[in-house]
Regions:
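Short, structured segments at the rim of ligand-binding sites
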Residues: 2-466
């Protein structure tokens, strides 16, 4: 308790006496390395609940924008790619290690990453890196487009059920690649790399397939059209980057994207969008704890459907051009949601929202339509006193008057964050293990929660503070 109170009292206030930049000012230029690796499995987040979160927080750069944009830097055959607002998270570290393993030079200064891929050499992605995260498969398209050959193991990352890369491979085949999948890896050769008309299944509008096809098509002969393309802001951010590199792309942000191939792409300078999922997480934390939180750096249009659902749940929302405030002024109301591709309810915010519904009055139905397995964390919430029943792809949540602290285990990135939020809204002490999942996508998660008065500390297994 003393350690938690001490950390809370000394925490910086984002938006008042400190900013996100001041937290990371200790970083100096260096070749990129993944500093989280040595800590994997050795730490936990300890939470004392019952304190409403209040204050302001700066949203970091987007994980889901950073990863494809970093991979797309391999397409530049001359000049440096300078990327700003890149978050300090484990998945970015893994992707930068991947680029280095393939022959690119990668340097970092604060939130800026500089990539020089002129001497791209290897067409073979290291298995140990690809299996760390699904987004590693994004390097397949740049390798095929530049080297006309790619050997990429099938990806890993969070366990969210089967997420095959068949859409990606089918598109590569239509563009002229000869592919095989053997011993857990895709091998592809593309002697004649050309544009194609590609139709994606409308149910999912795969973001991963959309961005891989966009990258692949930039250096293909002729025109490529993607029907039922993903419309996420992260797709738009990538398209903006590719166009700065010399690519010819129309329609990003709509269901039909057209790419006219060019002979080469060059380095450029670009800024990563801020993270809408991180913003939604902190807004939800206000509801779970009965608090009042303002997030800065995100246009509300990136969260419009989620904002509507927060309001339906009884949270008061106000916003400006690049800020959103969530204030809890009345008891939470049960609210039904169904996840869907953008502009629908984001699957990455399903776990935080379900956690909030555990404390709402009434019965909620949370329907998961994007991933087959994304309720594994529900068993952990049951340990805290939640009332949840799972039926196929739907969780029925009956609100309870309180949650109780317990030792729980993160099952994936977003579930890990949601369990920390559950601890903040619970009575007593909660310990969250497997926090390496959270490191994959949230920059300075504990520091930011502490800046909002959250009683949170990160510890090693021996109890030492980090």
């Amino acid at each position: 308790m003393e350690a938690l109170n001490s950390m809370r009292d000394n925490a910086p206030r984002l938006g008042t006496s400190a900013t996100a930049e001041s937290i990371t000012s200790k970083h100096t230029p260096h070749a990129f390395s993944n500093s989280h690796d040595s800590r994997v499995g050795d730490e936990r987040i300890v939470v004392l609940g019952g304190v409403p979160l209040r204050g302001e927080v700066e949203v970091s750069g987007s994980k889901n924008s950073s990863l494809p944009i970093l991979a797309a830097s391999l397409l530049a055959s001359k000049g440096q790619c300078i990327l700003h607002n890149v978050p300090h998270i484990a998945d970015v570290g893994t992707m930068c290690e991947m680029l280095q393993a393939l022959g690119a030079s990668v340097q970092r200064e604060g939130h800026t990453v500089i990539i020089d891929a002129e001497n791209l050499q290897s067409h073979s992605a290291p298995t140990e890196l690809v299996r760390k995260m699904r987004a590693s498969f994004y390097v397949a398209a740049p390798l095929l487009a530049r080297l006309h050959r790619a050997e990429v193991p099938l990806p890993g990352g969070c366990v969210l059920g089967p997420r095959p890369v068949n859409y990606h491979i089918d598109a590569f085949q239509k563009m002229g690649a000869v592919t095989t999948v053997e011993r857990g890896a895709m091998n592809a050769v593309a002697e004649h790399w050309h544009g194609a008309s590609i139709y994606l299944e409308p149910k999912n509008s795969s973001v991963g397939a959309t961005v891989n096809i966009m990258m692949a098509a930039c250096l293909a002969t002729g025109t490529t059209t993607i029907e039922n393309a993903a419309r996420e802001p992260e797709v738009v951010n990538l398209a903006e980057y590719l166009k700065k590199m010399g690519g010819k792309i129309r329609g990003a942000g709509t269901a039909t994207i057209t790419i006219q191939g060019v002979k080469e792409l060059h380095g450029t300078e670009h800024t990563i969008y801020n993270d809408r999922i991180e913003a939604g997480t902190y807004l939800t934390a206000a509801g779970i704890t009965g608090g009042d939180v303002t997030v800065h750096g995100l246009p509300p249009v990136h969260l419009s459907v989620y904002i509507d659902k927060l309001q339906e749940a009884g949270i008061e929302i106000t916003h400006g051009d690049r800020w959103i405030r969530a204030a809890t002024v009345q008891p939470l109301r049960a609210t039904d949601v169904a996840t869907a591709p953008f502009p629908g309810f984001a699957t990455d915010l399903q776990a935080p929202f379900l956690t909030m519904m555990c404390l709402a009055e009434g019965r909620s139905a949370i329907e998961e339509n994007v991933f087959d397995v994304r309720f594994n964390y529900a068993a952990e919430l049951l340990r805290m006193g939640a009332d949840i029943t799972l039926t196929e792809n739907t969780a029925i949540v009956r609100g309870v008057s309180k949650l109780s602290g317990a030792e729980v285990q993160a099952t994936d990135l977003r579930a890990g964050a949601a369990l920390v939020l559950a601890g903040l809204g619970a009575e007593g002490r909660t310990e969250v293990t497997k926090v390496e999942y959270i490191d994959r996508g949230y920059e300075h998660f504990v520091d930011k929660l502490r800046s909002l008065d959250g009683q949170v500390v990160r510890q090693t297994k021996s109890g030492n503070k980090k």
